[in-house]
Each structure stands twice: as structure tokens, then as C-alpha cells.
Curated annotation (Swiss-Prot):
EC number annotated for this UniProt entry: 3.6.4.-
SUPFAM superfamilies given in the database record: Actin-like ATPase domain
GO molecular function, one term: ATP binding
Role of this protein: Actins are highly conserved proteins that are involved in various types of cell motility and are ubiquitously expressed in all eukaryotic cells.
Species this protein is from: Schistosoma mansoni
Keywords: ATP-binding, Cytoplasm, Cytoskeleton, Hydrolase, Nucleotide-binding
InterPro entries xref list: Actin (IPR004000), Actin/actin-like_CS (IPR020902), Actin_CS (IPR004001), ATPase_NBD (IPR043129)
Catalytic reaction(s) noted: ATP + H2O = ADP + phosphate + H(+)
Protein name stated in the entry: Actin-1
SMART domains: ACTIN (SM00268)
Localization, UniProt: Cytoplasm, Cytoskeleton
Similarity comment text for this entry: Belongs to the actin family.
Superkingdom of origin: Eukaryota
């Protein structure tokens, strides 16, 4: 079968969710949690076919009896055995494809250590026998998905937040900034402030409930102090949420106090700058001639940028930091939760990209180091 007829696979491995599918599609076919679960107790039902590990949604649904681990922390793979399980699950259970028949485009965090790219490359060629592969930087793909080649991407997922300035399709590594504050930290913070209200959430299973509350009810206030005043003086901002056991809880100012930590990391006891300042600092590390293009093409990407009100707040905060005459445009595509994957789907289906793949033959000749020469 000719190389041209085979759809490439696009796999975006995030700290929280894995997004996978076929190049040319407009959305990923499979989206599942990047988790591997192992039973906490010895099985007693012989012949029940209990497995020694579960991946993704199955691990999620059996979370009550499992210990859940995330192999990707802060955007970077830290446990390769579990990562291999996630890839195996992606190919064979989710996409139901034979990896040796398809080129594979993987994504990586900005500033991913060199050894990690090599390890990814090695596993793809040696364990899964893929015919060809490529590794692309997540934020760059998000920018492609928005139809741009120049701009600054604020990519905030579950494990890490990055600001990545990109000029004519190339990320500018000296100006990339990383903030170890993302969705998982906000979920933990939400657990903490709900405890103050008298609701107790402690286990890994309960954390998932809190994550759902966060995703459904939180929003970013345009003016935090003013919103706190409104919340204190009326119940207009209160919402209720039904827990799996039928108990109904009410939340008020937690709805916007939780994501406010993105702008004020001191809420989490962190000394870092907020996402608005980090974006500004990233722009200021770039050449003075390209800053205008970055201010006017600030693209939001990733699940933790999905809060209602976040774009308006970013606009307000960056306008306060930037020169007064500067035109500032915050782009918040509705599909930004999946824009990294969508960008990968676009890239892998371009005819001009086909010569960019690292082939099995090149890998066999040069070894894992080939990835640094071909993927930049």
C-alpha cells in the first residue's frame, strides 16, 4: 500500500487528557484521561479476569478500587512504562489500528528535555514499529490551528502553562516561559476552598468530582474585588451542584476565586507571576520589532483557558501592562481545548509536510538523535 493512502495518526499526550485520531479529521476520535490505575487490593474473585493495570476511562470508572497515576507531570513524561501502556491503549483499544502501518505525529511540551524526545522516538520505532514519526511542539500546533504562523500562544492544560512566542512558524526558545500552575493545581485549590465551606473532598476519586464542579461552574471575574463584593452582598452568584450520592452542595465566590489563581498565583502560595504577566514578560523577551505582531495575535489554548471571562480579563490585564497605543487582540477559539490536536491534524495532512517525517530507515541509520535534526 502506497505511503500516500495511509492516514497519519495524531496523538497529543497531555498531562490530564490524551487526544488521538487521524490526520485530516477535524476533531480527535479518542479523548481519554492520561491515567494508569493499579488495583489497591488483591483480587478475591478468581476467574473474573481482573487485570494488573487499567488505562484511561476504564481506570477512571474503577477508580474506587485503584491507585491512579499520571505518567505525564507538568507536560513532561516521567514514567515511561506507564506511558507505553497509554500509547498501547491508544493504538489498540481506542483507535484500533496497527501502529506499524501508520506514520505517527506526537506532540511535546515546549522546552521538553532532549533525552525525552529521544526516548519517545525510540519507543515508537522499537516497541511499536511505526513506519515514520514526527514530534511537534504543542503551542506551535495551536497557532497553526488558529490559521496563523506568527503570534504568542498561552497554552494552559492540566499540568503546566506555557507562553510561547512564535515567528513565521518557529518557536523562539529564549522567550518561552513556563508556569507550573495549571488545571490540576486549580482542582486542588478548589478542593481546599470547598473544605473551608465544610465539604470534604480528599481521595483521588473525589478529586475527579471537584474537577467536574470546576469545569461546569467556574468563571474568571473581570474585576476580582468587585465580584467578591457582589458575592458577599447577594446570592446572585450562587450555584448548586448534585454530587454522585445525591447530596446537593452550593458554591458562591469559589466559582471565580478558584481560576483567579491563574492571575494571582499567591492564592496557591506560589511566588510566580500570573498568566497575564507571564505573557507580557514573554513578549518583552522578544525582539522589539516583532512585539506588535505578538500583542495583536495572543492565542489562548488548552483546557485551562476554557473559563468564561478569561479572554476579556486577559485583554484588560495586558492592556494595563503594554504601551498605551498598542493594539491588543486576545484570540480564544471555541475549540481551543483541542487546538493542539487540530493543529497536528492540519500539519500531518499538508503535502509539504510529507518530506518532514522521520522514516524507520533514517532511524535505523542514525538512532534516536535524528529527532533533533528533523524536528525543530
Amino acid at each position: 500500500m502506497a505511503e500516500e493512502d495511509v492516514a497519519a495518526l495524531v496523538i497529543d499526550n497531555g498531562s490530564g487528557m490524551c487526544k488521538a485520531g487521524f490526520a485530516g479529521d477535524d476533531a480527535p476520535r479518542a479523548v481519554f484521561p492520561s491515567i494508569v490505575g493499579r488495583p489497591r487490593h488483591q483480587g478475591v474473585m478468581v476467574g473474573m479476569g481482573q487485570k494488573d493495570s487499567y488505562v484511561g476511562d476504564e481506570a477512571q470508572s474503577k477508580r474506587g478500587i485503584l491507585t491512579l497515576k499520571y505518567p505525564i507531570e507538568h507536560g513532561i513524561v516521567t514514567n515511561w512504562d506507564d506511558m507505553e501502556k497509554i500509547w498501547h491503549h491508544t493504538f489498540y483499544n481506542e483507535l484500533r489500528v496497527a501502529p506499524e502501518e501508520h506514520p505517527v505525529l506526537l506532540t511535546e511540551a515546549p522546552l521538553n528535555p532532549k533525552a525525552n524526545r529521544e526516548k519517545m522516538t525510540q519507543i515508537m520505532f522499537e516497541t511499536f514499529n511505526v513506519p515514520a514519526m514526527y514530534v511537534a511542539i504543542q503551542a506551535v500546533l495551536s497557532l497553526y490551528a488558529s490559521g496563523r504562523t506568527t503570534g504568542i500562544v498561552l497554552d494552559s492544560g492540566d499540568g503546566v502553562t506555557h507562553t510561547v512566542p512564535i515567528y513565521e512558524g518557529y518557536a523562539l526558545p529564549h522567550a518561552i516561559l513556563r508556569l507550573d500552575l495549571a488545571g490540576r493545581d486549580l482542582t486542588d485549590y478548589m478542593m481546599k476552598i470547598l473544605t473551608e465551606r465544610g465539604y470534604s473532598f480528599t481521595t483521588t476519586a473525589e478529586r475527579e468530582i471537584v474537577r467536574d464542579i470546576k469545569e461546569k461552574l467556574c468563571y474568571v471575574a473581570l474585576d476580582f474585588e468587585q465580584e467578591m463584593g457582589t458575592a458577599a452582598s447577594s446570592s446572585a452568584l450562587e450555584k448548586s451542584y448534585e454530587l454522585p450520592d445525591g447530596q446537593v452542595i452550593t458554591i458562591g465566590n469559589e466559582r471565580f476565586r478558584c481560576p483567579e489563581a491563574l492571575f494571582q498565583p499567591s492564592f496557591l502560595g506560589m511566588e510566580a507571576s500570573g498568566i497575564h504577566e507571564t505573557t507580557y514578560n514573554s513578549i518583552m523577551k522578544c525582539d522589539v520589532d516583532i512585539r506588535k505582531d505578538l500583542y495583536s495575535n495572543t492565542v489562548l489554548s488548552g483546557g485551562s483557558t476554557m473559563y468564561p471571562g478569561i479572554a476579556d480579563r486577559m485583554q484588560k490585564e495586558i492592556s494595563a501592562l503594554a504601551p498605551s497605543t498598542m493594539k491588543i487582540k486576545i484570540v480564544a477559539p471555541p475549540e481551543r481545548k483541542y487546538s493542539v490536536w487540530i493543529g497536528g491534524s492540519i500539519l500531518a495532512s499538508l503535502s509539504t509536510f510529507q518530506q518532514m517525517w522521520i522514516s524507520k530507515q533514517e532511524y535505523d541509520e542514525s538512532g534516536p538523535g535524528i529527532v533533533h535534526r528533523k524536528c525543530f
